[in-house]
């Protein structure tokens, strides 16, 4: 039985992680470190191999064949986490974007690197760029690509996050996968949740009506995933802070160079030609995905009540969802998900990005396509189906460690099917490799804790 907390209790609970973070971050002075992968038995003899003069031989080999960097260096398991910190949680309120310091994003990027390592066995390096210019971010990423097997773009404000991702994905000179987790990762988890939620309510993709509340970095990239799954674009109504998107939205048309995806939605969705706001967008909808402003009361119970029977409602605002889950349920929603871990059905991108990158690195993929992300979503949904799907269990949690290798294998197979992999490995080989790599990362962390190399948490 779910324990329902009051608003005051939830707010107090929401403050505790920040209080603990201010106590623990200065104690550990960072969350990730670089550690040797090779033996060091004798400084003189071993460093003659690992450094000069011996290292000249693999350097020459890579010069002749750049793909050998995956064999002779850490490139094959290293990802860059690239940000300008303009969308970092805690910096968006009280600071003008131009005044945000890139270095202020380091604690968050280190936390991301920690998740990469522990859940995916991926070595991730935080890189906070001292520029907010999208073209310079693109250029810096291209300059850095020789050192990395992949790039995770993180916490870059819109609309430049769309521009940066699109330019890097379409650039023929970029030969490593580039992923924007705020866009693609969240869309992947939402899709996984909807796959199982629709099974519960017994509805088909090609029949449902969808309301997307918020037209930013979550819902705009989600729409192609929904269409690929069978949703009819005309059955989707998207609403931003100024109302429903439609062809007469001149404010969007005037900015279509920066918001190309949003303008396309204006032109191609909403076949009924609806006008109005959130209430009108949600009326009669089978599914509502809200990624807008924190609640409560950003979405009202009567708007949920006006949805179709057996409705599905995902409210993803932080720290408080647009409507409390129990209010959505009382108003008639059958399945409810939020971005919070203290409610059932947490929709969080941490469930997918470690496994997806594990898969693309293991086959040395050249890019991450929507089809690869959809394959990961389907595998996440399948994992939960095997464990049991019900109204409060539509996706796994990050504690379900064995879901990540399965995502990796599914993504690796899809990359090969699309001709985007440098290596050819079977599903069984990919699964085994991912399991071993992730287990090793977690065992190493436990060993460092057991031996005191990672200090125990200090007393309060």
Predicted regions and their residues:
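General beta-strand structural signal in soluble alpha/beta enzymes
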Residues: 126, 152-155, 178-181, 238, ...
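Rossmann-like adenosine-cofactor binding region
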Residues: 260-334, 340-342
């Amino acid at each position: 039985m779910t324990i329902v907390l009051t608003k005051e209790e939830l707010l107090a609970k929401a403050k505790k992680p920040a209080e603990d973070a201010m106590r623990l971050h200065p104690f550990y002075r960072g969350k990730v470190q670089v550690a040797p992968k090779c033996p060091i038995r004798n400084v003189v003899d071993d460093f003659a191999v690992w450094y000069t003069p011996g290292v000249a031989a693999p350097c020459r080999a890579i010069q002749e064949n750049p793909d050998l960097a995956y064999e002779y260096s850490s490139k094959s398991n290293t990802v860059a986490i690239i940000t300008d910190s303009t969308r970092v949680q805690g910096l968006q309120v009280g600071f003008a974007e131009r005044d945000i310091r890139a270095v202020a994003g380091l604690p968050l990027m280190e936390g991301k690197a920690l998740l990469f390592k522990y859940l995916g066995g991926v070595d991730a390096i935080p890189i906070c760029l001292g520029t907010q210019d999208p073209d310079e971010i693109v250029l810096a990423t291209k300059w850095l690509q020789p050192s990395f097997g992949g790039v995770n773009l993180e916490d870059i404000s819109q609309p430049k996050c769309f521009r940066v991702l699109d330019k890097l994905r379409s650039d023929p000179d970029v030969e490593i996968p580039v992923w924007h987790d705020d866009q693609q990762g969240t869309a992947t988890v939402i899709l996984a949740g909807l796959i199982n939620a629709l099974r519960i309510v017994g509805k088909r993709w090609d029949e449902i009506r969808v309301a997307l509340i918020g037209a930013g970095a979550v819902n705009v990239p989600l729409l192609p995933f929904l269409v690929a799954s069978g949703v009819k674009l005309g059955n989707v109504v998207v609403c931003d802070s100024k109302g429903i998107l439609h062809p007469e939205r001149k404010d969007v048309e005037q900015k279509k160079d920066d918001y190309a995806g949003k303008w396309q939605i204006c032109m191609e969705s909403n076949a009924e030609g609806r006008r109005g706001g959130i209430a009108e967008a949600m009326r009669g909808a089978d599914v509502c995905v809200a990624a807008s402003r924190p609640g409560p009361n950003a979405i009202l119970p009567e708007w949920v009540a006006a949805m179709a029977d057996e409705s599905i409602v995902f409210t993803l605002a932080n720290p408080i969802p647009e409507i409390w889950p129990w209010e959505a349920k009382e108003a008639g929603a059958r399945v409810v998900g939020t971005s919070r871990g203290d409610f059932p059905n947490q929709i969080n991108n941490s469930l997918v990005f470690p496994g997806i990158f594990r898969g693309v690195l293991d086959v040395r993929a050249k890019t991450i396509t929507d089809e690869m992300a959809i394959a990961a979503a389907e595998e996440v949904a399948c994992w939960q189906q095997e464990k049991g799907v019900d109204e409060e269990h539509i996706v796994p949690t990050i504690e379900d460690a064995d879901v990540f290798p399965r995502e990796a294998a599914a993504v690796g197979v899809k990359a090969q099917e699309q001709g985007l992999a440098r290596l050819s490995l079977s599903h069984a080989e990919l699964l085994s490799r991912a399991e071993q790599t992730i287990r090793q990362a977690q065992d190493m962390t436990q060993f460092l804790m057991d031996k005191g190399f990672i200090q125990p948490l200090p007393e309060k």
